[in-house]
Amino acid sequence: MALSLGQFINVGGMVKDLKSFNFSVYGRWFGYINIILCIALGIANLFHVSGVIAFGIISIIQGLVILFIEIPFLLKICPLSDNFIEFIKRFETNGWRCLFYLAMAIIQYISIAVMATSLIVVAVGLTISSISYAVAYTKHQEFQNTNIIKNPTDDDFPHEAVVREML
């Protein structure tokens, strides 16, 4: 029995999220996309021979921080300092996440002053997340978790026995 990505993604939850019209969910979806964009394009921009390398490193760090913000389950399973966990827990509301993503986007927009690179895509992605959280905040929508990634406590989540069988 092999594990597949489909076992970890909840398609029914995605449809439910789309119908909810809760912009905090959309912000979280773009947050997942931003994790991939920040890390991938950050690595890609390490090969420039200019000051863009610094912004590439910042982008990689941003991707890792967003990973812990958008997937809070990782805070419980990864050995992290208490200061870092407290820092991440500050961003549990729409308003704070809006400001966080806006600050991150501004940092990446500054990279354009050095050289126009693919980090513009990172900046735009972070801006979209910021706008989504801002709309949720102004509409007084409750911060809501998405149903895309299955919760490890769900009955149909692949457990240790499945992993042991695979090995």
Swiss-Prot record:
It comes from the Eukaryota. Coiled coil: none annotated. It is a multi-pass membrane protein. The chain crosses the membrane at residues 23-43, 49-69, 98-114, 121-137. One of its GO terms (cellular component) is Golgi membrane. PANTHER family: CALCIUM CHANNEL FLOWER HOMOLOG. This is Golgi apparatus membrane protein TVP18. It comes from Saccharomyces cerevisiae (strain ATCC 204508 / S288c).
